Amino acid sequence: MARWKRETGGSDVAPRRRGVLATGFSWLLVIAWAAVIFSMSAQQSTGLSSGFTGQVREVAVGFLALLGLAPDSFSVICHFAEYLVFGALLANAFSCRLGLGKSFLLALVCASVYGAGDEFHQYFVPTRMCDPLDWLTDTLGAALGSFACVLALRRRR
């Protein structure tokens, strides 16, 4: 039993050994989502207020106002949501070959490091800034996303 736990990252649940195709697809989704995050961060804040993105923002801010939330909370919610998805995708990809405990921790660390790098990247984008609170929000979103993914995978196994 101790050997089993050691091989599965301390989990009583065996790692799901998926095929090469499923594993590759899981990592492709991670890379695609990381590219979405990077491209959103590379846009100037004025670019996020126009076109389709601006229309989505207007509707969302209107909805937040109905809930009694400040329009500034839209940015926080977006950061949280994009990293919630990122954390879940990372945990799923890591779980192809690792136990659930290690998958959760690696997903959280990778998403947090990527979030820190993303905030640093925004420092060089005109009209954007590097905000440690955004990084914290990213990390919290990734924690919830990876935890939810691990719980769902645990139920499946």
Where does each model-flagged region fall?
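Bulky hydrophobic segments
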Residues: A2-F124, P132-L133, T139, A143-R157
